[in-house]
Amino acid sequence: METATDPVCLEGVSVRFGSRKVLRDLTLTLQSRRVGIVGRNGSGKTTLARLIAGLIAPDAGRVTVAGVDVCTDRRAAIRTVGILFQNPDHQIIFPTVEEELAFGLRQLGRSKAEAREGARAMLARFGRDDWAERAVDGLSQGQRHLVCLMAVLAMEPRVIVLDEPFAGLDIPTIRALRRYLEALPVTLIQVSHDIAALREYDRVIWLEGGKVAADGPADETLARYLAAMEEVDDADADL
Amino acid sequence: MLTLTSEIRTPYHPIRAGAKLALLCAATVGLFMLGSLGAMVAANAAVAALYLVPGRPFARDGLRLLKPVWIFVALVLAWHVLTHDTRAGLVIALRLTAAVALANLVTMTTRFDDMVEVVLWLLSPLRRLGIRTAPIGFAIVLVVRFIPVLLAKARSLIEAWRARSPRRAGWQVALPIALVAIDDAEHVAEALRARGGFDTE
Amino acid sequence: MERQITLIALFAALIAVLGLVPQFTLASGVPITAQGMGIMLCGTVLGARRGALAVLLFLALVALGLPLLAGGRGGLGVFVGPTVGFLVGFPIAAFVAGWIVERMRNTPILTAAFIGAVIGGIPVMYVFGIIGMSVTLDKTFAESALLVTPFIPGDLIKAGLAAALTASLLKARPASVLSRG
């Protein structure tokens, strides 16, 4: 059931990398609780994900999440939107789990003690109390994904952007992580090649060449997207 | 791969790298042996002429490569003006610009691969001492491969920091960057070993 | 053998990447680049010989025309400019830093690496740097020394970071710390 949530608004957003136009004059308002973004490699989905998280500045237009200009007001942005990247090894900064979870809380302004408390509380929520002192190095791939998720959740954002969050994991692990995600009351915006993951979503947007090719209920957009992908022959593959 | 070699074709590009380097050495030694203001002015004029032969855009690129030297030129001139020894200051400054500009000219007109060949050739006498030079050429290739990969990983980690903090990335990102770098090196070493490695020569 | 060569190449690349990190500015208004820390790390992590080789490899690439020095500088020009002394000092600094870490085998790595990084990265490197400046700018040693003193506090910070990083690497990836191998 769709519920009105904190809107993610893109107004006339364009992004250029050098001479290449990655996103063209995009205007979107995302208010569904579960939004999926599909598209081919190079379509601009990853750039869109980073825009919503406030990590890239648009060359034109504005991006706001729940009224916060996520690019210019970083202080408020980190309270509002979080992002989960594809590879935990490119995300985890600190050597122990507790430090990694506490980092975001410190950046939100909590004291060292409060941050430690918050980290432990998050670990308890997931039944991983014993992970506090553990070295991230010693954890498995799936466990590292969970650490990244907990680190983002600890900051209690209203919107979480997921950029291909399950790449490289085995099926049971994906299932378990998905269960955690689906139970969350926050808005999820997931960029994915995994169609199955997005079937249950409220709204799916298909990005093609930096523009919106289709936008609507999940089953509609996904059907159109899959049909189009069937039409693409080998010559147009990303090789 | 981004090198400093100019994409603008010059008449100097086809000249053999070894020859250009030898000329450069001779010219640099000469510059440091001459002491007169007149000689320095002449030298700079000659260098400027060399740069203008391929055209103004090329000369402008050359000027840009000289930017780091300007601050030293300014320092030297200021110093010497204050100590009432302007003439000596001008000699030093002009010698500096001529020497650096000449060296840059060689860099701008010589391909990276040709330079590597010269280096390996210069190192070849080492083989008589039992030192193998093949790994050196290989090491060069490896560094060129590592730099963009390392950069990308560093950027990802810095981005991951910025996703959770309004502040610029701090010194703490140095460790995870070093770790992913070392792990990448392990994979490369493994791939090398799988393809025969160095010990099978 | 493969691991040693790849590590040497990796650290040479690391020096380059550290040169691309944006400069910090100290309270005194002096800009510091992270590249010097890379030099120290080559010594403290790889040891004297291999650390020096890594730095020489880096310098070779700069000479060959890659813009790897902080600020995107490179090419043969930098070897005739006023900073040439520092470039000569780089591999020697790494060697000394590594030699100290190797010699102080029984001292905890953090201390040994700090001492190595400070001695290699500051007095050794600066002596060569100052000589180079004196020759190219036609100044006395003392006069050139004056020009570089503001950069020393930044280098102390870099030495501390290099030492901490070396110690962490010894814990996390002991096989890569060739200075204590």
Model feature map: region roles:
Chain A
Residues 211-235:
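Conserved beta-strand-loop-alpha-helix hinge in the C-terminal portion
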Residues 53:
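Helix-to-loop junction immediately C-terminal to a conserved catalytic motif
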Residues 160-164:
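Catalytic Walker B motif of ABC-type/P-loop ATPase nucleotide-binding domains
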Residues 135-139:
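Conserved ABC ATPase signature
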Residues 61-72, 77:
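Conserved ABC transporter NBD signature motif
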Residues 113-131:
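Conserved ABC ATPase "signature" region
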Residues 8-10, 22-23:
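Conserved structural motif at the start of ABC-family nucleotide-binding domains
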